[in-house]
A protein has these predicted regions:
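Short loop-to-helix capping motifs
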Residues: 34, 161-163, 206-207
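C-terminal all-alpha effector/ligand-binding and dimerization domain
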Residues: 129-137, 167-234
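Short basic (Lys/Arg) and small-residue
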Residues: 156
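Short linear motifs at protein or domain termini
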Residues: 1-107, 114, 232-233
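Hydrophobic/aromatic residues within well-ordered alpha-helical segments
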Residues: 9, 13, 104-108, 124, ...
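All-alpha effector-binding/dimerization core of bacterial HTH-type transcriptional repressors
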Residues: 76-152, 194-214
């Protein structure tokens, strides 16, 4: 039976290496050999192998006999994994990742808003209103306003009544944090209350078309902002 200490050490190494992989430390150099890693971290081979297994389960690395361990391309990473998502948030600014996150939101959130208008789950809709009211109340506090904005959008996923949307909460939550934080910085202000209220009002009225369009409007504006900053960097 593996000791709790061994598992704890392996997890700590996995976190350190995983963060280094996702933030690009090994983009220009190969992934270290097992011996190099053991020397660097002062860990046993058993513990290091366990850490690498954890990284492999997240899609970050792959190991082949006589070829060693290599970092996998981003498309093979498990982007639904909470650790991978957290590390992605620590990457240097990347137009591509912000654009892709916002595109994903555009594919999901307007449909969720339309479904919420159709389902009419009163408790879930009340949670959306709570999110909007929190956005208004925290308008002068950037961090609190950001969290309220996230809560608003996540509440819409719940109100959709679609369990698959709700299961995407960890991914959507991080996508929201990344994209909203960026667009707030670009625009110079926190989220527009009126545009968010338009989504809520449409949902409360049961107007699925208006709810979908209001959600799309916010996200398309976010895409424009991201494309603008990308153009300025080129």
């Amino acid at each position: 039976m593996r000791s709790e200490l061994g598992v704890s050490l392996a997890y700590g190494l996995m976190r350190s290496l995983g963060q280094s992989i996702v933030t690009g430390e090994f983009e220009t150099v190969g992934f270290p050999t097992e011996a190099e890693l053991c020397t660097k971290f002062g860990a046993s081979r058993t513990v290091m192998r366990e850490a690498v297994k954890m990284l492999s389960a997240k899609g970050l690395v792959s190991s082949r006999q006589r070829q060693g361990t290599r970092v996998e391309p981003v498309e093979n990473w498990n982007l639904l994994d909470p650790d991978v998502l957290r590390w992605l948030m620590e990457r240097p600014f990347s137009n591509k990742i912000f654009l892709e996150f916002t595109q994903m939101r555009l594919a999901i959130e307007p449909t969720a808003a339309a479904l919420a208008a159709q389902v009419q789950d009163k408790l879930a809709i009340a949670a959306i209103r709570e999110g909007l009211e929190a956005m208004i109340a925290t308008a002068g506090d950037q961090d609190a306003a950001l969290q309220a904005d996230i809560d608003f959008h996540v509440a819409i996923l719940k109100a959709s009544g679609n369990p698959f949307f709700w299961r995407l909460k960890p991914l959507i939550n991080n996508a929201l944090r990344l994209s909203i934080e960026l667009t707030n910085k670009i625009s110079g202000h926190t989220a527009d209350i009126a545009s968010h209220e338009a989504i809520l009002v449409a949902i409360e009225k049961g107007d699925a078309v208006a709810a979908e369009q209001a959600s799309e409007s916010i996200l398309k504006e976010s895409l424009k902002l991201i494309e603008t900053i990308a153009a300025l960097k080129n």
